[in-house]
Amino acid sequence: MRIRWTLTATGDLTQISDYIETHGSGSAARGVALSIHVAIGLLAKFPMQGRAGRIANTRELVLPGLPYLVVYRVSEDEVQILRLLHGAQEWP
């Protein structure tokens, strides 16, 4: 199964990385981005590992050790990454 990022999700990752780099360090930002990519990469093999989403036809993956949530949709041949959200953000 392939992973496809929406423009919104890509923007979310950029904002997360920029925030961490500004308020922490570049290496911390790269580490968080790598952890997010690794967790999302596992969705290609285990697309149902996240819980049922709060919006119909979505799933939500809580990232272990990070305060972030991945909102995604699964189809026959693709996992579509819809959003990356901080756990404190109101969703939906």
Where are these regions (language model features)?
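Basic, Lys/Arg-enriched alpha-helical interface segments
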Residues: 2-58
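Structural motif corresponding to alpha-helix initiation and N-cap regions
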Residues: 55, 65-66
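Enriched for short, Lys/Arg-rich terminal
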Residues: 66-69, 73-92
